Swiss-Prot record:
This is Protein kinase C-binding protein NELL1. The keyword GTP-binding does not apply. It has been demonstrated that ROBO3 binds to both NELL1 and NELL2. However, NELL1 is not expressed in the spinal cord at the time of commissural axon growth to the midline and has no significant effect on commissural axon repulsion in vitro, suggesting that NELL1 is not a functional ligand for ROBO3 in commissural axons. It remains possible, however, that NELL1 functions as a ligand for ROBO3 at another spatiotemporal location. It comes from Homo sapiens. Residues 434-475, 476-516, 517-547, 549-587, 596-631 form the EGF-like domain. Disulfide bonds join 395-407, 401-416, 418-432, 438-451, 445-460, 462-474, 480-493, 487-502, 504-515, 519-529, 523-535, 537-546, 553-566, 560-575, 577-594, 600-613, 607-622, 624-630. Residues 1-21 form the signal peptide. It holds the Pfam family Laminin_G_2. PROSITE patterns: ASX_HYDROXYL, EGF_1, EGF_2, EGF_3, EGF_CA, VWFC_1, VWFC_2. Ca(2+) binds at residues 434-435, 437, 453-454, 457. One of its GO terms (molecular function) is protein kinase C binding.
């Protein structure tokens, strides 16, 4: 579809939006405070005065609590989120200074589908969500844990994230679209992540989720709203993709119809039959008298069957005989001469040749043909007057035999005899019918066989699980021993009456046809279970269950360039540029791309007045020859810090800075745990209170205040009894396509877009499917003729994958 058409539709949506207005449909929003019935909740919350009096506000106290929704509320939330690409999470909060806590969380076990968190430890707002089944986190630096009232609204429109704080647009980002089809069993928590973690300390008011575009208007009605939203555009693109899918299906049907039409054009509309110069229409029937058959024209083909003759009940003075020009025998008077009975047309040689006609022997005169044989080979056929040579073909002249009988020559005559497997009808072998050997028990099929009647014969079929020995016998088939089975190599094959069965060996699971090794504790971080309780770990992990990360830095496995330092990551590592150096844009894993920052040329130094800036590797120096201007003072935040002055940063009470000879040096405050007035926020290692300890997310390990650890691709820290986690810092990659390998947390560069799991789709880069239909980048379709193969257009590349579970079920 041309882009100008997209813009036209976009304009129409925008115009319609302007006309309709932005009134909030109550069915498309959820008031969390009301749904959780906090008024009647006493443990851990108390109603207090809020930022305004239009709604109730609640203080979330610093004690264990369980503020979550009832099952029917969670089900309502599932329905509201289903297939939605636009929603806003908003609340009015007053958070205790320097604390961290979750404002709202929608979770299922360990998975945060939607979560809004405020960290006073790192002064940032975090949005946790799920994309394609994998956790994602957006960290937005902002200090909200300051004891002041704030209105926060986080809006998501497809891949567009917008954060408003106090009706000011703070951040706008492009993110991975979140999964909005929530699974059964999710739960909605307010003021906490779960029973023990993420406890919010402060007041929450107006907690809501709005399922409409620009939901922040509910909180800040005076804000301008844009038109259209990212989701509007996504809907248009999805509409185009749906049209492309419909076009592909219609193209396939059209191609099939054209093929059928082409075939029809090569044949007559009405199939006729031409026989002996006569034209018969479809379904016409006629009698082929020459061959005594009933024939029918069926779709241009002639089908003929032997004419069936009715049984004859001739009187005692008549006999059934064939009459020329007729297919069935008729009753005709018989003749008797000298005790011999003659049928109509039969002859007898006395003194003269006589023939039976109408019951009377009539004298006939017949010239016998000369014979080409010696006299001793002359024979007189039965009921004939002329002699023939021995070996004469009587069938060529003789009786008409039916389709299930055959003519047989004798010395002096020809007769009809039923074919094998047929029996004469009323004693007349010219007409024969099939013998059902199975029903008549005239077969020789042995045990473990089934008799199957066929025209003129029968067949002995083996029952399932048996194989043929000869035409009449079958024996049990050892499918397991012969290898003629479909059991997995890790399954036990057992012969059965019906064939065989497959059962997975101990330590393996599956249906017997497919068996996979089972590891009781699983294989973590992308490890593969290759044998019972045996894992093969991916690069970067070790342990019996791949549970241990290999610290490439501390174990000296790698060596970074001296301009960088080694930073360990789960399953991997990277060399991070040291202070005073930056990456040149090429990104080298070993840190060779780290080059010196020239603070002098960039004017990022702090040299004052007459002092000269001298660039050094990883830093700079201030050189002042002499004179009154060589004070060594340092410019700082629009002011001046004197040489030797020491101060604490306003935005970070745990850092202390000093000015020395024109250069500013900052460091973390030194901690003296012997000093009873030590700031435990800055020196958590000095906090020995049991209440300041933290349980990890799994509830298995206890950490002291100040301890750090890694969990689910996040760096976590225990501080005064509460756990605060933030995304691991990953290296900045300059490549077009990236992918996060199984078990790892940070992306790596890949050259093939089909391998990329984080890709920005360019709808201008289209793909051609197998029908020749152009597909937009990001489109997904099923491959023609292969229902288990799914294809996706990734910036001009068709990337297909096979669903092996689908193959097993089909």
């Amino acid at each position: 579809m041309p882009m100008d058409l997209i813009l036209v539709v976009w304009f129409c949506v925008c115009t319609a939006r302007t006309v309709v207005g932005f009134g909030m449909d109550p069915d498309l929003q959820m008031d969390i405070v009301t749904e959780l019935d906090l008024v009647n909740t006493t443990l851990g919350v108390a109603q207090v005065s809020g930022m305004h009096n239009a709604s109730k506000a609640f203080l979330f106290q610093d004690i264990e609590r369980e503020i979550h929704a009832a099952p029917h509320v969670s089900e309502k939330l599932i329905q509201l989120f289903r297939n939605k690409s636009e929603f806003t999470i908003l609340a009015t909060v007053q958070q205790k200074p320097s604390t961290s806590g979750v404002i709202l969380s929608i979770r299922e076990l360990e998975h945060s589908y939607f979560e809004l968190e405020s960290s006073g430890l790192r002064d940032e707002i975090r949005y946790h969500y799920i994309h394609n089944g994998k956790p994602r986190t957006e960290a937005l630096p902002y200090r909200m844990a300051d004891g002041q009232w704030h209105k926060v609204a986080l809006s998501v429109s497809a891949s567009h994230l917008l954060l408003h704080v106090d009706c000011n647009r703070i951040y706008e980002r492009v993110i991975d679209p979140p999964d909005t089809n929530l699974p059964p069993g999710i739960n909605l928590w307010l003021g906490q992540r779960n029973q023990k973690h993420g406890l919010f300390k402060g007041i929450i008011q107006d907690g809501k989720i709005i399922f409409m575009p620009n939901g922040y208007i509910t909180q800040c009605p005076n804000l301008n709203h844009t038109c259209p939203t990212c989701s509007d555009f996504l809907s248009l693109v999805q509409g185009i993709m749906d049209l492309q899918e419909l076009l592909a299906k219609m193209t396939a049907k059209l191609n099939y119809a054209e093929t059928r039409l082409s075939q029809l054009e090569n044949c007559h509309c009405e199939k006729t039959c031409q026989v002996s110069g006569l034209l018969y229409r479809d379904q016409d029937s006629w009698v082929d008298g020459d061959h005594c058959r009933n024939c029918t024209c069926k779709s241009g083909a002639v089908e003929c069957r032997r004419m069936s003759c009715p049984p004859l009940n001739c009187s005692p003075d008549s006999l059934p005989v064939h009459i020329a020009g007729q297919c069935c025998k008729v009753c005709r008077p018989k003749c008797i001469y000298g005790g011999k009975v003659l049928a109509e047309g039969q002859r007898i040689l006395t003194k003269s040749c006589r023939e039976c006609r109408g019951g009377v022997l009539v004298k006939i005169t017949e010239m016998c043909p000369p014979l080409n044989c010696s006299e001793k080979d002359h024979i007189l056929p039965e009921n004939q007057c002329c002699r023939v040579c021995r070996g004469h073909n009587f069938c060529a002249e003789g009786p008409k035999c039916g389709e299930n009988s055959e003519c047989k020559n004798w010395n002096t005559k020809a007769t009809c005899e039923c074919k094998s497997g047929y029996i004469s009808v009323q004693g007349d072998s010219a007409y024969c019918e099939d013998i059902d050997e199975c029903a008549a028990k005239m077969h020789y099929c042995h045990a473990n066989t089934v008799c199957v009647n066929l025209p003129g014969l029968y067949r002995c079929d083996c029952v399932p699980g048996y194989i043929r020995v000869d035409d009449f016998s079958c024996t049990e088939h050892d499918e397991c021993g012969s290898g003629q089975h479909n059991c997995d190599e890790n399954a036990i094959c057992t012969n059965t009456v019906q064939g065989h069965s497959c059962t997975c060996k101990p330590g393996y699971v599956g249906n017997g046809t497919i068996c996979r090794a089972f590891c009781e504790e699983g294989c973590r971080y992308g490890g593969t279970c290759v044998a019972p309780n045996k894992c093969v770990c991916p690069s970067g992990f070790t342990g019996s269950h791949c549970e241990k990360d290999i610290d490439e830095c501390s174990e000296g496995i790698i060596e970074c360039h001296n301009h960088s330092r080694c930073v360990n990551l789960p399953g991997w590592y990277h060399c991070e540029c040291r202070s005073g150096f930056h990456d040149d844009g090429t990104y080298s894993l070993s840190g060779e791309s780290c080059i010196d920052i020239d603070e002098c040329a960039l004017r990022t130094h702090t040299c004052w007045n007459d002092s000269a800036c001298i660039n050094l590797a990883g830093g700079f120096d201030c050189l002042c020859p002499s004179g009154p201007s060589c004070s060594g003072d340092c410019p700082h935040e629009g002011g001046l810090k004197h040489n030797g002055q020491v101060w604490t940063l306003k935005e970070d009470r745990c850092s202390v800075c000093s000015c020395k000879d024109g250069k500013i040096f900052c460091r973390r405050t030194a901690c003296d745990c012997q000093n009873p007035s030590a700031d435990l926020f800055c020196c958590p290692e000095c906090d020995t209170r049991v209440t300041s300890q933290c349980l990890d997310q799994n509830g298995h390990k206890l950490y002291r205040s100040g301890d750090n650890w890694t969990h689910s691709c996040q760096q976590c820290r225990c501080l005064e009894g509460e756990v605060d986690c933030w995304p691991l810092t990953c290296p900045n990659l300059s490549c077009e396509y990236t992918a996060i390998l199984e078990g790892e947390c940070c992306p790596r560069c890949v050259s093939d877009p089909c391998l990329a799991d984080n890709i920005t789709y360019d709808i201008r880069k289209t793909c051609l499917d197998s029908y020749g239909v152009s597909r937009l980048s990001g489109s997904v379709w099923t491959m023609a003729g292969s229902p288990c193969t799914t294809c996706k257009c990734k910036n001009g590349r068709v990337c297909c994958s096979v669903d092996f579970e689908c193959l097993q079920n089909n």
